[in-house]
A protein has these predicted regions:
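Secondary-structure junction motif
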Residues: 3, 45-67, 132-140
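Beta-alpha-beta core module
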Residues: 6-20, 34-35, 81-128
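Hydrophobic/proline-rich hinge and linker segments of small-molecule sensing/allosteric domains
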Residues: 10-52, 119-130, 140, 144
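Short, flexible helix/strand-to-coil boundary loops that buttress conserved ligand/catalytic motifs
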Residues: 25, 35, 60, 105, ...
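Conserved SAM-binding loop
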Residues: 49, 75, 93-94
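A local structural motif
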Residues: 65-74, 108-109
Length: 145
């Protein structure tokens, strides 16, 4: 499960990895010369973002609010690979999680770090004080070794 912030107290967990938002730009975009881009530099861009029914959208919108940006949104989608394709065609820029961006990267896009960013944690979680099934206990033991 992906968490932005802390895992709720009622759960135990094993953290597998962390992830962060990055900027996805067409490879010929003028900001690709920078290794890190302040979000404020994207204020005049047209965005292609993940849809409003995702946790990513809530966090992304908070990043915009925290930097005083009202994004111009051309398109919202559900699939990171489609968003990356549209960015690669020059239809706009995007903010996506680094792992999505790296997995679906094409020569037509460039990935850049942003400031500020938001970090997520990908974890296996289970309820505290609740016995695990034998299969779940075996799986958990396997992961912990």
């Amino acid at each position: 499960m992906r968490f932005f912030g802390e895992v709720p107290e009622q759960y135990d967990y094993i953290e597998f990895c962390r992830d962060e938002f990055v900027a996805i730009l067409p490879s010929n975009h003028m900001l690709t010369i920078h290794d890190t881009i302040p979000i404020s530099k994207l204020k005049n861009e047209t965005f292609i973002l993940l849809g409003k029914d995702t946790k990513f959208d809530l966090v992304c919108q908070e990043l915009f609010r925290s930097t005083g940006i009202t994004p111009r949104i051309r398109l919202m989608g559900r699939c990171p690979e489609n968003i990356i394709g549209f960015v690669g065609m020059g239809m706009g820029v995007s903010l996506l999680m680094r792992r999505h961006a790296e997995f679906f990267k094409t020569p037509q896009i460039t990935i850049r770090e942003i400031t500020p960013t938001a970090e997520s944690r990908i974890c296996l979680i289970w309820k505290k004080n609740r016995p695990l099934s034998p299969a779940a206990a075996t799986f958990l033991k396997f992961l912990q070794e």
